[in-house]
């Protein structure tokens, strides 16, 4: 982890030097010394990157000219109001000076120069539906599908996707693939989709926590970055800190939205990152494609009991749950405003929401992972929103798997040191300060993301809805409800595994 973070810092500094060099020179009396130190540190980290097998360029350099072939990626066309999720990572027309735009331009130029391939995009409101029709007709109008994990999972079960394990050049051990999720994605010898560095919504959908530094400082809460590093950031500590922040401002004995200060803001879906954050496995895949049902394990039962103690509806004295205000117009926009107005100490959300907050928030804030269950837990674990995280797949209709594999791998490899650092830089500098602590936390969050197949196929298993109901119930009776629900989940999983392993793929 430390080596990967050093590599990332080198990339981040390289990406940001034109933006920050003047500021660096004014931070000390001797700007030259500061600049020299940073340059030396960057050079050392870049040397580490060159020697790391996970970041070594092993793609061919000769005789791979595809003579201006257009490699088309089918992706999402979002409504104008969906600022957080708009696709900006596939292809752009020109340099504009905007960091991510120019990084995509550079990445695509590298691919064009080296392999004679032009990257093009076809954005559709429902790309998976369009993709299915094209695949059914045998039309190879697109080379790669970029859509949500939830949609990719559905297409995998229905037999529309090629096994990415069969693609030449694709190497899931490389740093530009999200290797921490592969254990949950791979079913036996089949991998039908994967998360890589070229698809930024795969990163944006990551669950994390923000803390309002004005409120944590006021409550006398110690440095939370150090707490995370020391392995002491736990659910118990979060609740203690949240309760210390909460204030009934007008003293009327009732906590009210927009009037009082809440300790933590969340939603019913927050049970997913909190439960996965304990290291719990819901459905555990075995190498041979079989699975182990874990929803009744002691670990899951104990974790759910603790999470219920934190999230239940009666905890409104310090918890603000946005789902309790479903009748409110623009409730999610207003929810963010509560945090921005210093009326919420902690906020559990997806990374996509950070930039919607950063531009207009006066108080500073920090990024940290969701907490562990207790200090004895081996590490922090994170996850993402399966209905928003973009992943990549290859249509079964693809006719040249060598070319498809090569360009897919090149997209990830070149994104790793162009698009991804630009996204980090954009996310962090939008806060008006370069925060290497938050950069370190993002690196930790991305490297520890867990994938649970039962959540990817939630439309069939119903596991997320089941967990949400139990997380907020004032009367906790998880064991009996899990027993009643188990047959439904196992039946769905049996069908999923059978189709993925032995269906028309």
What are these regions (language model features)?
Residues 17-21:
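C-terminal motif of bacterial Sec signal peptides marking the signal peptidase cleavage site
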Residues 67-101, 117-121, 144, 264:
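Short, well-ordered beta-strand elements
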Residues 74, 139-145, 149, 187-209, ...:
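Extracytoplasmic/periplasmic solute-binding protein
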Residues 114-186, 219, 338, 359:
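Extracytoplasmic "Venus flytrap"/periplasmic binding protein-like
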Residues 169-177, 281-302, 375-382:
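Short, solvent-exposed loop/beta-turn-alpha elements that line the ligand-binding surface or hinge
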Residues 239-242, 282-327:
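Glycine-centered hinge/linker elements that transmit conformational signals in sensory
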Residues 358-428:
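Extracytoplasmic/periplasmic substrate-recognition and gating elements
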Residues 393-405, 415-505:
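Conserved C-terminal helix/tail region of periplasmic/extracytoplasmic solute-binding proteins
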């Amino acid at each position: 982890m430390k080596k990967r973070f050093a590599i990332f810092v080198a990339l981040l500094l390289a990406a940001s030097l034109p933006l920050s060099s003047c500021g660096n020179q004014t931070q000390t009396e001797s700007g030259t010394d500061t600049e020299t130190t940073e340059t030396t540190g960057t050079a050392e980290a870049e040397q580490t990157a060159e020697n790391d097998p996970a970041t070594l360029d092993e793609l061919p350099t000769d005789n791979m000219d595809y003579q201006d072939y257009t490699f088309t990626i089918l992706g999402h066309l979002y409504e104008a109001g969906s600022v957080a999720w708009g696709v900006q990572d596939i292809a752009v027309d020109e340099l504009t000076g905007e960091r991510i735009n120019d990084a995509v331009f550079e990445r695509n130029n590298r691919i064009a120069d080296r392999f004679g391939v032009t990257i093009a995009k076809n954005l559709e409101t429902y790309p998976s539906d369009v993709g299915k029709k094209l695949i059914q007709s045998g039309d190879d109008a697109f080379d790669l599908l970029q859509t949500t994990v939830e949609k990719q999972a559905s297409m995998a079960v229905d037999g529309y996707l090629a096994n990415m394990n069969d693609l030449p050049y694709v190497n899931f051990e490389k740093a530009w693939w999200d290797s921490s999720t592969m254990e949950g994605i791979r079913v036996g010898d089949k991998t039908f989709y994967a998360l890589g560095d070229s698809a930024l919504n795969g990163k944006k959908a990551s669950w994390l926590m923000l803390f309002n530094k004005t409120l944590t400082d006021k409550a006398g809460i110690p440095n939370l970055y150090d707490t995370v590093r020391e392995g002491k950031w736990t659910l118990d500590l979060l609740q203690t800190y949240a309760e210390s922040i909460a204030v009934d401002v007008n003293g009327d004995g009732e906590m009210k939205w927009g009037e009082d200060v809440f300790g933590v803001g969340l939603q019913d879906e927050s049970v997913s990152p909190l439960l996965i954050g304990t290291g719990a496995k819901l459905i555990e895949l075995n190498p041979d494609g079989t699975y182990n049902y874990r929803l009744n394990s002691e670990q899951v039962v104990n974790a759910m009991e603790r999470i219920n103690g934190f999230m239940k509806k009666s905890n409104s004295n310090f918890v603000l749950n946005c789902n309790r205000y479903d009748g409110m117009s623009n409730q999610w926009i207003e929810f963010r405003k509560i945090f921005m107005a210093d009326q919420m100490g902690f906020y559990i959300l997806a990374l996509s929401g950070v930039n919607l907050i950063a531009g207009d928030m006066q108080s500073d804030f920090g990024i940290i992972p969701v907490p562990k269950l207790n200090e004895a837990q081996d590490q922090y674990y994170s996850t993402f929103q399966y209905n928003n995280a973009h992943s990549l797949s290859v249509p079964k209709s693809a006719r040249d798997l060598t070319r498809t594999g090569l360009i897919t791998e090149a997209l990830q490899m070149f994104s790793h040191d162009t698009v991804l650092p630009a996204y980090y830089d954009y996310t962090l500098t939008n806060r008006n300060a370069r925060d290497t602590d938050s950069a370190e936390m993002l690196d930790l969050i991305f490297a520890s993301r867990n994938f649970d197949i039962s959540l990817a196929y939630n439309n069939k298993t119903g596991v997320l809805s089941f967990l949400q109901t139990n997380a907020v119930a004032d009367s906790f009776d998880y064991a009996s409800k899990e027993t009643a629900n188990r047959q439904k989940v196992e039946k769905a999983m049996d069908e999923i595994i059978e189709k993925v392993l032995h269906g028309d793929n």
